[in-house]
């Protein structure tokens, strides 16, 4: 039960971070492209690579904390559903190129960020 509380608390924190970070990114870059969603997903992809690799190589992050961070915080921070919805809206609006770029950049950049997180964890 304690584990669920940690996941819920960090999940709520992740959701709040997503709300404020994506909002800030949209204020800076505008809404012509899903920049805010991309930004939080890139951050989350980097962090999951870092946390998971570091926790595999070290006992510094106990499983309870690892689950709270990855399932809770990063689950709240990142959003595949919003990515899907925004991409669908772009397709629906006829912005096929922007939708394609969103999918391509999101997948390639998130995988790259995860890899960078893993490499950083290995260097620590």
UniProtKB/Swiss-Prot annotation:
UniProt keyword Lipoprotein, yes or no = no
Q: Where in the cell is it found?
A: Cell inner membrane
Q: Which UniProt keywords apply?
A: Cell inner membrane, Cell membrane, Ion channel, Ion transport, Membrane, Metal-binding, Sodium, Transmembrane, Transmembrane helix, Transport
Entry keyword Disulfide bond: no
Question: What stretch or stretches form a coiled coil here?
Answer: none
Q: Where is the signal peptide?
A: none
Cellular component annotations (GO), alphabetically ordered: plasma membrane
**Family statement drawn from the similarity comment of this UniProt entry:** Belongs to the fluoride channel Fluc/FEX (TC 1.A.43) family.
HAMAP family found in the cross-reference section: FluC
Its function, per the record, reads: Fluoride-specific ion channel. Important for reducing fluoride concentration in the cell, thus reducing its toxicity.
Q: What is this protein called?
A: Fluoride-specific ion channel FluC
Classification lineage = Bacteria, Pseudomonadati, Thermodesulfobacteriota, Desulfuromonadia, Geobacterales
């Amino acid at each position: 039960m304690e584990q669920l509380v940690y996941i819920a608390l960090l999940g709520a924190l992740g959701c709040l971070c997503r709300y404020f970070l994506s909002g800030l990114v949209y204020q800076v870059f505008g809404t012509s492209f899903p920049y805010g969603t991309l930004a939080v997903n890139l951050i989350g992809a980097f962090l999951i690579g870092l946390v998971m690799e570091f926790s595999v190589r070290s006992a510094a992050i106990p499983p309870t904390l690892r689950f709270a961070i990855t399932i809770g915080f990063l689950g709240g921070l990142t959003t595949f559903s919003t990515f899907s919805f925004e991409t669908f809206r772009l397709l629906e609006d006829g912005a096929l190129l922007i939708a394609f770029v969103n999918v391509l950049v999101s997948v390639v950049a998130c995988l790259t960020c995860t890899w960078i997180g893993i490499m950083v964890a290995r260097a620590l």
